[in-house]
């Protein structure tokens, strides 16, 4: 829909364009001229403002009054001099009036409307006054007018008195004062020469109509009532001797006669008695267009050159127009584009790494418009670029939407529902008769070096800690042991999570798959920060806790202190009246290990319903995964429900394939794995992530499609996470100052959990904003030649965690100069990379005062300016050093330099304390006796 213009709105309201422009200026809207277009909301405000100001319709009031015909039976006021005749009171019955002879009785008439006619023709005041005086003189010499009596139905004259057609021929009548000759009035706007040209042949006339269209409901024009006027040269006037004046219809105003250059006679009201002949064309050479008199009622407009003409019709707005206006009102403009807005409570759910196109589909908007809006908000992005949650929050707040980013769990659940897989619904549909008891899954948690792995080693009667570098568990291990309970053996599955803070995410996943948590606390150290962190993870997962107080055989151990400290965190021992079992153990001597297993089984039987359905496809979690040189991708999985068999098609995260072989923690082959059983699976296409869910599908194709969709989702999430938000100001500054420095890393590790934990730890390193840490690639396995090629292109450093490069990769790295660093303990990797980032920072400088000199005398020289005679109070004054002048503690001159330094007549490089000298500060001459000259130097500030 086209936008309205100012002059159109002014014409619709009935005011001139200047008034509308002035009102717009008051409203604060910048509009150039009457032809400028404005927005529909601004148009509505303009109309409301004009209506409130009381100026609406003032310009259109005279025209409306003239166009409205008098109602039947309405009383009219006394005729005014110079006005048109108005109908008098309408009696119910009136006798017929005989037509008087023209020679005896003059025809009753009212004064001419000379003033109105001259005003409409825009004549000068002088000509109007002269004609008005002549009209009054003629009216005074005429016979007093008799009241005209009208009947409801005026009789038609006899057939012999048919009037001549109103074709513009002058008619004789009562003598009237001689009007000025047309064409001789230099002040008149109409210079017609009396005789009208043929209608339609005047190329300069504003009215090109070939005749006036009869009024609606009338068969012809009404006969004009006789009016006084001077005889015009030409044919005799009809209605003369022997012809009576045809009275007007009931309640109708008699139509006026046409006149040169003036307004033509008024058209009869619809429904008036019709008369024979043709309607008179518009009078005058350049008369006002339209033959409908002053008022342009229905049918009053002049016909156009090729058919129906007339004035501008005012039709009602269609539903489509109103709907378009409503949509424009509901979609305001932002940044020059129209976008739909929310009410502030509209929730829009987006997946991780969503793009502007995804957001546009949710709110039914154009992606290009949203890109423009985001650009005006200071963010630059393309329509298909993955954005982070913070950027969507900014955009949603501006548009009135609440952005809700779907969690990874919900996103994966929705993805599986697309393949008709609903894991939660499967568990709800299972009956109690198909559920069987499964072993409990226990997670060992605690602080670093509190003996978690040593305790698990004592339980398994095997030494697994010797294979860990530095005695620190680097990846998750899952084992199943058998313990005697009430006369028979029962299985317990243990998951050993690393205690270092870098593996927080891995420990969190361990708490999500566990049934019972064993919190290991050293009796000599007591509660430590990671002990509280592990406790919070277990409580957040709503997991029962069994506390193992380790190292009770060590000197200085105080198990009672541990019980007292844990009481502050809501863990109250049974001996203190609580419900948490505390067991004193010694992993070194094996004391209390059997009591600990007994406590685990009692806790499982008391408060947990450990049952699952083994007779269905397997579902579970990948505990850890690694890339074996001879066996390929190997994943340690924990079956939560169902049975996993060799040959099943499985998908775990972004990896898929068929189970080629399964082995337990001892390396023995397993053909079937039941619930709560940890096994190593071979046959996956890639290495899944630690904590990824796995499931068995009916076909390989389904597993591959699920893996590909998960990979795309994860890729978008990584792109959104790695995206650097940059504003317009930062972008301009970056263009001026150059590229921001960054340290690119490639991380390769032996297991996926360690790689992920190392990546998260590196991203937490806090350095200055001028240096960025970018991890461009991560993977599991040895460093390959492709990794070296990628590092060559991006100037990256390769970090190897418990892996080594192959010979080709080592040779290419030496040839290309790629830095490859290998670590077996995570502490060393974090420290060295943090040092590298700190070394890339730009040096920081600070001001150091080097000397202060007091001005004792000022020597003025026409060649060198003012020279300060000083004495050095402290430090050393050095030539070319930066200086500032201080007067009464206020700096009066800054960014100066010691351009000349002399002792007596010799130039010197420095002057020490308590020596006098002469100092020249170049063009700076605002120095006085008593001022101080302070010299400073910039020294590099060491980083902490």
UniProtKB/Swiss-Prot annotation:
Its main location: cytoplasm. CDD domains: IF2_eIF5B, IF2_mtIF2_II, mtIF2_IVc. Residues 446-453 are annotated as: G1. Residues 471-475 are annotated as: G2. Residues 258-269, 284-310 have a biased composition (Gly residues). InterPro entries: EF-G-like_DII (IPR053905), IF2_II (IPR044145), IF2_N (IPR006847), P-loop_NTPase (IPR027417), Small_GTP-bd (IPR005225), T_Tr_GTP-bd_dom (IPR000795), TF_IF2_bacterial-like (IPR000178), TIF_IF2 (IPR015760). Keywords: Cytoplasm, GTP-binding, Initiation factor, Nucleotide-binding, Protein biosynthesis. GTP binds at residues 446-453, 496-500, 550-553. Residues 123-135 have a biased composition (Basic and acidic residues). It comes from the Bacteria. Belongs to the TRAFAC class translation factor GTPase superfamily. Classic translation factor GTPase family. IF-2 subfamily. One of the essential components for the initiation of protein synthesis. Protects formylmethionyl-tRNA from spontaneous hydrolysis and promotes its binding to the 30S ribosomal subunits. Also involved in the hydrolysis of GTP during the formation of the 70S ribosomal complex. HAMAP family: IF_2_B. This is Translation initiation factor IF-2.
């Amino acid at each position: 829909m086209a936008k309205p213009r100012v002059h159109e709105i002014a014409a619709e309201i009935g005011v001139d364009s200047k008034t509308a422009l002035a009102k717009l200026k008051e409203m604060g809207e910048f509009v150039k001229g009457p032809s400028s277009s404005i927005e529909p909301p601004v148009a509505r405000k303009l109309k409301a403002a004009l209506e409130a100001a009381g100026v609406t319709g003032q310009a259109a009031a005279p025209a409306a009054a003239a166009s409205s015909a008098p109602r039947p039976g309405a009383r009219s006021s006394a005729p005014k001099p110079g006005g048109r005749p108005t109908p008098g009171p309408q009696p119910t019955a009136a006798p017929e009036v005989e037509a008087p002879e023209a020679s005896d009785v003059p025809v009753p008439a009212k004064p001419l409307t000379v003033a109105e006619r001259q005003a409409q023709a825009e004549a000068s005041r002088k000509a109007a006054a002269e004609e008005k005086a002549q009209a009054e003189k003629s009216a005074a010499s005429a016979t007093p007018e008799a009241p005209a009596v009208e009947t409801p139905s005026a009789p038609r004259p006899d057939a012999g008195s048919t009037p001549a057609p109103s074709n513009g021929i002058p008619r004789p009548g009562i003598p009237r004062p001689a009007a000025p000759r047309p064409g001789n009035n230099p002040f008149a706007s109409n210079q017609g020469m009396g005789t009208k040209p043929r209608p339609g042949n005047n190329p300069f006339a504003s009215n090109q109509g070939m005749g006036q269209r009869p009024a609606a409901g009338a068969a012809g024009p009404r006969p004009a009532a006789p009016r006084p006027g001077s005889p015009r040269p030409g044919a005799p006037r009809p209605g003369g001797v022997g012809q009576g004046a045809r009275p007007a219809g009931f309640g109708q105003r008699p139509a006026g006669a046409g006149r040169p250059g003036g307004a033509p006679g008024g058209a009869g009201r619809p429904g008036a008695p019709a008369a024979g002949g043709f309607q008179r064309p518009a009078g005058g050479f350049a008369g006002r267009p339209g033959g409908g008199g002053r008022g342009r009622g229905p049918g009053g407009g002049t016909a156009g050159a090729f058919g129906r003409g007339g004035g501008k019709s005012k039709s009602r707005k269609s539903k489509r127009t109103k709907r378009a206006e409503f949509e424009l009102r509901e979609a305001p403009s932002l940044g020059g584009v129209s976008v739909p807005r929310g009410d502030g409570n509209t929730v829009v759910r987006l997946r991780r790494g969503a793009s502007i196109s995804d957001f546009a589909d949710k709110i039914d908007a154009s992606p290009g418009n949203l890109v423009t809006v985001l650009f005006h908000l200071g963010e630059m992005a393309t329509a298909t670029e993955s954005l982070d949650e913070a950027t969507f929050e900014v955009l949603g707040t501006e548009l009135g939407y609440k952005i809700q980013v779907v969690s990874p769990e919900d996103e994966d659940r929705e993805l599986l529902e697309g393949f008709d897989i609903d894991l939660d619904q499967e568990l709800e549909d299972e009956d109690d008769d198909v559920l069987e008891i499964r072993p409990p899954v226990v997670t060992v948690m605690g602080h670093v070096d509190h003996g978690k792995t040593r305790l698990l080693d004592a339980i398994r009667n095997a030494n697994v800690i010797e294979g860990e570098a530095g005695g620190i568990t680097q990846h998750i291990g899952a084992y199943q042991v058998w313990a005697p309970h009430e006369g028979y053996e029962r299985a317990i599955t243990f998951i050993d999570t690393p205690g270092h803070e870098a593996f927080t995410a891995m420990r969190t996943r361990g708490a999500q798959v566990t049934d019972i948590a064993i919190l290991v606390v050293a009796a000599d150290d007591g509660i430590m920060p990671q002990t509280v962190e592990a406790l919070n993870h277990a409580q957040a997962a709503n997991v029962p806790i069994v506390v193992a107080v380790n190292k009770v055989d060590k000197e200085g151990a105080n198990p009672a202190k541990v019980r007292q400290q844990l009481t502050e965190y809501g863990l109250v021992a049974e001996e203190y009246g609580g419900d948490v079992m505390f067991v004193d153990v010694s992993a070194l001597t094996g004391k209390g290990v059997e009591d600990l297993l007994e406590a685990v089984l009692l806790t499982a039987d008391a408060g947990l319903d450990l049952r699952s359905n083994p007779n269905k496809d397997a579902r579970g979690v990948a505990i850890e995964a690694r890339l074996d040189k001879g066996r390929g991708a190997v994943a340690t999985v924990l079956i939560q429900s169902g049975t996993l068999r060799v040959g099943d098609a499985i998908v775990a995260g972004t990896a898929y394939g068929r189970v080629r072989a399964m082995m337990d923690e001892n390396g023995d082959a397993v053909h079937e794995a039941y619930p709560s059983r940890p096994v190593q699976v071979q046959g996956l296409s890639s290495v899944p992530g630690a904590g990824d869910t796995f499931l068995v599908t009916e076909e390989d194709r389904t597993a591959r499609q699920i893996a590909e969709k998960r990979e795309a989702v994860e890729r978008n999430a990584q792109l959104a996470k790695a995206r650097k938000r940059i504003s317009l100001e930062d972008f301009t500054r970056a263009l001026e100052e150059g590229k921001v420095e960054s340290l690119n890393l490639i991380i390769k590790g032996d297991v996926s959990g360690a790689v992920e934990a190392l990546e998260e730890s590196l991203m937490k390193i806090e350095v200055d904003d001028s240096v960025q840490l970018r991890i461009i690639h991560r993977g599991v396995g040895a460093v390959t030649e492709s990794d070296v090629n990628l590092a060559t292109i991006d100037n990256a450093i390769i970090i190897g965690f418990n892996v080594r490069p192959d010979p080709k990769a080592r040779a290419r790295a030496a040839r290309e100069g790629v830095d490859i660093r290998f670590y077996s303990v995570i502490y060393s990797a974090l420290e060295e990379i943090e040092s590298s980032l700190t070394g890339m920072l730009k040096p920081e400088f600070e001001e150091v005062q080097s000397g202060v000199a007091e001005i004792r005398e000022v020597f003025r020289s026409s060649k060198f300016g003012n020279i300060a005679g000083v004495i050095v109070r402290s430090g050393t004054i050095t030539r070319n050093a930066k200086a500032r002048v201080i007067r009464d503690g206020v700096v009066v001159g800054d960014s100066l330099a010691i351009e000349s330094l002399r002792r007596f007549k010799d130039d010197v490089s420095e002057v020490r304390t308590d020596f006098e000298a002469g100092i020249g500060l170049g063009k700076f001459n605002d120095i006085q006796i008593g001022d101080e000259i302070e010299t400073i130097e910039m020294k590099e500030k060491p980083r902490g």
